[in-house]
Amino acid sequence: LLGEPVEARFGKDFPIRFDFLDTVGGGNLSVQVHPTTQFIRENFGMYYTQDESYYLLDAKEGATVYLGLKTGIDKNEMIEDLRKAQKGEIVFNTEKYVNKLPAKKHDHYLIPGGTVHCSGSEALVLEISSTPNLFTFKLWDWQRLGLDGKPRPINVERGKEVIDWKRDTEYVKQHLANHLTKISEGDGWREERTGLHPNEFIETRRHWFTKPVTHHTNNSVNVLNLIEGEEAIIESCLL
């Protein structure tokens, strides 16, 4: 099922997870950061972290994604504002510190560990990620309360240890936002790579086709998701 290269690295763990994040008619998700591989190994004994990406399945008017830090911010000031917000002393000014990007259907944003991010409102996001999902450090949750009537748990102190402060506006534009590479094309089909950051092991490819096409798994696990159209019929062929 996994293929020998994947099984050799991850054992019996299935390393890929798809989640659907629906904020259409709702609010922003929590501003958060996932730990780097080094941090999660040294502190939690795991050998890979939750790198992920956002693929926009749909986006209504005003849809946004928050990704990376604004160039030139004062990191000490940002952390202090997060601490004050956690205590209820201020409302954290997210747009002062975090890039707010307009989002449209079929956009793809890479989110390697250490990158501050969240999905904004009015978006339907396919979140493609690796599987250690217990290590999300939330930084700000827009003053929302839990079922107990108290502010939802926030982990600023852990989060500040893993934020990659070099992931600023320019870095996001150059490395994380909509980097499309054409792999190949033919009569009635086109294959594109939409994401693979050097720190990540999940490569994402997008296939457009109007007639039957053949794809090779290359001795690795492949997870498919229909992003346009009503249905696709997939048949396995043993060679």
Model-derived features: positions:
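Active-site region of the double-stranded beta-helix
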Residues: 1-105, 118-230, 234-238
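Glycine-rich, mobile lid/loop segments that gate access to catalytic sites or pores
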Residues: 108, 112-114
